[in-house]
């Protein structure tokens, strides 16, 4: 009889654990889709020079490191966009985008091809990109991103 009780308790515990993992995986999958949608919105805003949307997407303490290794704040990026110093003609993403969710933080890595200029300097080329997104009351916002040029080997 004791053995049946132990087996029953063990089975219930395993089922409960499996359900918790399933709920967490579903939450991560939903968050990943939200991040991917926000990335599309972000890229469209960059291409259309939509400062109002970028103002919402970038956190107040946002930092961008461009392919030349220069860092820029949210205010600097917006000023470059409004002045025309930053102007992108196209952004295409390779199929290798990876979105990793860690609670209210998402880390996104990918390979991108950009045509245009950043901060008044030609920036056309291929890059490895890393973006760090945080989810707060305003939804998913970009807190930091960096582009690293891909060079031929």
Name each model feature, range by range:
Residues 115-117, 150-152:
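Sequence/structural signature of outer-membrane beta-barrel proteins
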Residues 30-34, 51-102, 111, 117, ...:
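A solvent-exposed, acidic/Ser-Thr-rich amphipathic alpha-helical stretch
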Residues 106, 112, 127-129:
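Hydrophobic core residues within well-ordered beta-strands of beta-rich domains
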Residues 126-151:
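Short beta-strand edge/turn micro-motifs at domain boundaries
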Residues 99-106, 133-139:
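A short, structured loop/turn motif at beta-sheet edges
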Residues 4, 8, 19-60, 141, ...:
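Short, low-complexity N-terminal intrinsically disordered segments enriched in polar/charged residues
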């Amino acid at each position: 009889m004791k053995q049946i009780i132990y087996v029953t308790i063990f089975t219930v515990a395993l089922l409960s654990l499996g359900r918790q993992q399933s709920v967490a995986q579903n939450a991560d999958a939903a968050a990943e889709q939200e991040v991917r949608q926000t990335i599309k919105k972000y890229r469209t805003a960059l291409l259309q020079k939509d400062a109002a949307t970028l103002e919402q997407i970038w956190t107040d303490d946002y930092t961008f490191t461009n392919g030349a290794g220069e860092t820029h704040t949210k205010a600097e990026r917006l000023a470059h966009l409004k002045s025309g110093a930053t102007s992108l003609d196209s952004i295409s993403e390779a199929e290798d985008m990876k979105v990793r969710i860690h609670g209210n933080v998402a880390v996104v890595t990918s390979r991108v091809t950009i045509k245009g200029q950043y901060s008044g300097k030609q920036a056309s080329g291929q890059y490895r990109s890393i973006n760090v997104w945080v989810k707060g009351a305003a939804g998913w916002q970009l807190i930091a991103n960096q582009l690293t040029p891909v060079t031929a080997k």
